[in-house]
């Protein structure tokens, strides 16, 4: 079966679709709506994707799905859409709970939004915490219509599709976690599901669907036990479903997070996959769920171990330089970021992946043999950690 | 006369692209060592422009021009290329001297590079100074050959040009100056000159040339007298 090469909506982040900002207040009666945002830029895609304007909400709805997709959780016929939404909402909750537990005080700020025709999302950001410089965990559920050309571009398929707009559904969780301590690593993960409906003039045409996602790890300093721990958890999740997954998705990750102009990777990899649909749908839903559930055990023990280590200004400066590489990758190459910026998504949700600060030092080269050099070498020549 | 709309080589700091080799300057040349060679990514322009690999140099040459472009300083007919190079070298020196005077102590670090077939440049960077967080002042002189498509893209001309690779010359100075104090503004400037030679299979075809450049001002806070001063000059 030919693999999908969806460039539209195959991005690691769905942040572009959660564009309205809403300040969360512990006391709902003191809540005030933010000033309306000035008009978004016109969509400038080669093919335009049609999405309604979002509306802020004061409370989290039980589901962002349209009524026709919403089946009670107890029903054995609950749709993949509904179960995927449940999964990403649960992942958001469990990751945020784990982060707040480590923080010991600071809480996430939450923005909730929805769209009249269905869909919406929740953005949570914790900034300037005790442990985290910046942590963002976003979920979004999007309904839209794309013209046939966008569908062909998204799917990379031959033009055997019937002409007519193609309704689509996309949902995902996306997160970047930047700790303060230079010895604690940055984590990124996202898991997403994409589905097309039959065009209105061709009822009964088969649906297309695929999964995408990944989890990757960006330390400034290598603690081999930490990298091995992280990669072992990814491999365990993969091996439960297919032993070819880890080697395949590990390589895909190393290739995706390549900073071409530097000839180095953003970090030390993890797993990454896109356009997966050549397996049983139930199996892939379980796989994505397993991967999302692996984020906390893969990452939190490492942060707990490193968050209070003593560090010097030199360590902090090196972390800042590596955060500069993170920025370079995200702004120049990351499909999620570039897609969001081009389609008029919510800028704050898109760029929440960037750290609070970063550094670009002219012609900086770590001295060979130092810990900084070891990290750079591992980003230039990806390793097999397990 | 139609204005040039060169998309290639028109970017404000595009000349840095051509001075990509790293070179640490050392106050004592005898302790100087060349850095381990860095693997460089392939050029990935929409149309490929052919440029030789650069070589680090320990001293500034009097000129980066090819001998045939001559540095006849005494001749009243010496070329626009030569005079433009002289101008940008002078601009680099004056700006760096003024910056160092404000700094009182920290000096620019200099990298000099050249290419065997002619061309080269000087990058100067002052980082973590007393006044400047980061100040860069670069000059470069480039000889290369571009395919006709790149030339049409650079010049946005109609396709009346003869097919065949087109030799070009480009020179420029480019600088960005970021002060430490949030009330002191960032400055960017660049001035560049671009010229094409006649293709080898069409000797005598007319040269094309154009200038580009600008100076712009990016404060974090507005002091109206400062902005007026800048725009008045």
UniProtKB/Swiss-Prot annotation, chain A:
Residues 1-48 form a transit peptide. Residues 125-134, 326-361 are annotated as: Important for dimerization. The lineage of its organism: Eukaryota, Viridiplantae, Streptophyta, Embryophyta, Tracheophyta. It comes from Arabidopsis thaliana (Mouse-ear cress). Its main location: plastid. GO terms for cellular component: apoplast; chloroplast; chloroplast stroma; extracellular region. Its EC number is 1.3.3.3. This is Coproporphyrinogen-III oxidase 1, chloroplastic. GO terms for biological process: chlorophyll biosynthetic process; protoporphyrinogen IX biosynthetic process. Pathway: Porphyrin-containing compound metabolism; protoporphyrin-IX biosynthesis; protoporphyrinogen-IX from coproporphyrinogen-III (O2 route): step 1/1; Porphyrin-containing compound metabolism; chlorophyll biosynthesis.
UniProtKB/Swiss-Prot annotation, chain B:
One of its GO terms (cellular component) is cytosol. Its EC number is 1.3.3.3. Gene3D superfamilies: Coproporphyrinogen III oxidase, aerobic. Pathway: Porphyrin-containing compound metabolism; protoporphyrin-IX biosynthesis; protoporphyrinogen-IX from coproporphyrinogen-III (O2 route): step 1/1; Porphyrin-containing compound metabolism; chlorophyll biosynthesis. The active site is at residue 188. Substrate binds at residue 174. It comes from Arabidopsis thaliana. GO terms for molecular function: coproporphyrinogen oxidase activity. It is found in: Plastid, Chloroplast. It holds the Pfam family Coprogen_oxidas. GO terms for biological process: chlorophyll biosynthetic process; protoporphyrinogen IX biosynthetic process. Its main location: plastid. Key enzyme in heme biosynthesis. Catalyzes the oxidative decarboxylation of propionic acid side chains of rings A and B of coproporphyrinogen III. Keywords: Chlorophyll biosynthesis, Chloroplast, Heme biosynthesis, Oxidoreductase, Plastid, Porphyrin biosynthesis, Transit peptide. It catalyses: coproporphyrinogen III + O2 + 2 H(+) = protoporphyrinogen IX + 2 CO2 + 2 H2O. Homodimer. Belongs to the aerobic coproporphyrinogen-III oxidase family. This is Coproporphyrinogen-III oxidase 2, chloroplastic. Residues 1-48 form a transit peptide.
